[in-house]
């Protein structure tokens, strides 16, 4: 691996370490990692700070993934898919294990989403992933499960559409596996029947309101 690719990973990791949830929480005198699900992502920001702050957190997390994957390789004259994928991985790792916040961050979903916008080949897969995420959410109410299903659907859709195990296929597969890892506590709580649900968005509850 060249020195420029290593530098891309390092700079992307440092960019990913800028945690929207923790920074926004400081303006509210809240350590988001000690509230709700103890996670620094947008979902916990919604639970603990409300929708406006959650949207700000989501924007920061998504954009830093896009910035790292799109601009850092370009600035270092390594504007290839390989460089962009390495930058993407660096940013996601930075979000989950932020250098500036004692390596305790979010679960990487928003940042990973931001990286996907850099690859035109994944455009339709983003739509498929969102549809699967939304469908899972309104039927189950579990955001963590929705994120896992979305990640898996992106990788499966790419493989089915392209029928090749190229760099982007490997990246999408690795991303979906990593989502399962970062949501392992959610999976455990779901198995125990203790996972929090967003019941307001569940389709069964929407029908009940209209009865």
What are these regions (language model features)?
Residues 1-7, 67-86, 117-126, 159-171:
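Helix-coil boundary and interhelical linker segments in multi-pass alpha-helical membrane proteins
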Residues 8, 12, 17, 21, ...:
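Alpha-helical transmembrane segments in multi-pass membrane proteins
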Residues 21, 26, 92-104, 132-140, ...:
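C-terminal ends of transmembrane helices
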Residues 22-52, 188-211:
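Cytosolic, membrane-interface loops and tails of multi-pass inner-membrane proteins
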Residues 31-42, 100-113, 142-150:
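Short, non-helical or kinked segments that cap or interrupt transmembrane helices
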Residues 46-49, 72-76, 90, 94, ...:
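Interfacial segments of multi-pass membrane proteins
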Residues 47-73:
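Multi-pass membrane catalytic core of lipid/isoprenoid biosynthesis enzymes
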Residues 125-129, 143-150, 164-175:
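Loop-to-transmembrane alpha-helix initiation sites
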């Amino acid at each position: 691996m060249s020195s420029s690719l290593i530098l891309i990973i390092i700079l992307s990791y440092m960019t990913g370490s800028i945690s929207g949830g923790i920074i926004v929480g400081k303006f509210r005198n809240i350590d988001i990692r000690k509230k709700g699900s103890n996670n620094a992502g947008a979902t916990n920001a919604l639970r603990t700070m409300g929708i406006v702050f959650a949207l700000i957190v989501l924007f920061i997390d998504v954009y830093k993934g896009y910035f790292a994957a799109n601009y850092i390789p370009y600035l270092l004259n390594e504007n290839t898919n390989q460089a962009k994928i390495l930058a993407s991985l660096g940013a996601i790792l930075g979000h989950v294990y932020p250098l500036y916040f004692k390596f305790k961050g979010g679960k990487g979903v928003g940042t990973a989403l931001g990286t996907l916008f850099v690859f035109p080949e994944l455009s339709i897969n983003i739509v498929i992933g969102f549809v699967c995420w939304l469908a899972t959410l309104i039927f189950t109410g579990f955001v963590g499960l929705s994120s896992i299903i979305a990640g898996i659907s992106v990788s499966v859709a790419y493989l089915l559409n392209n029928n090749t195990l190229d760099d982007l296929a490997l990246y999408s597969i690795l991303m979906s596996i990593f989502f399962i890892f970062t949501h392992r506590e959610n999976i455990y709580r779901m198995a125990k029947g203790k996972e929090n649900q967003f019941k307001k968005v569940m389709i069964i509850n929407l029908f009940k309101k209209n009865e």
